[in-house]
């Protein structure tokens, strides 16, 4: 299994782009990674879980160097929740933000499970986007860092072959909830090894550490979600999420 870096920075990271809720922390003396139920629960559960993790680690907001969040693509409500909370907490504590590609979180978790020795590999990611579509991407791990081969996109399952292997080279590993949609297309029998991923928190934290080391931090106002799919109107629940996580309210959590 891949290991976290020992670094002087203290980072808080969380992701609510899927049905799971992931929260992680690292600081010079250690790290914590937690995965639990998200989805409709995420908007109410995220801030309490963050505060619980901070308390368990014995950290204050002033001890943090940056806040990372899964920027998407993914579920609308989940992306709004994570982005609003990240911005609110960061502004309240005067911290920068590290936006992390949510599909790359899946790729990093799959890589750690299929190539724990850090060997180079390509990973194709497909996440169920509902409505018969997928959020898909392809990434390349060179043994030290990630590169984007095919950027995240919204597509039909039938469109995956040219996306995943435009050069004829099949990615060595596939991962994501969208793989369940592939048998209906007749593609499943031709696909390479598929990997289940379930430790998003640790994968997110490793990516946050890499982003921090590479100077990927931005001001809170510049940290935006990546949706890929347009949406005309918000549901009542989504409007409630936005109201709950507006900056002043969320910033108050920093002082709690």
What are these regions (language model features)?
Residues 37-45, 76, 80, 84, ...:
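Residues at secondary-structure transition points
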Residues 74, 89, 174, 205, ...:
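A residue-level signal for conserved active-site and pocket-lining positions in enzyme catalytic cores
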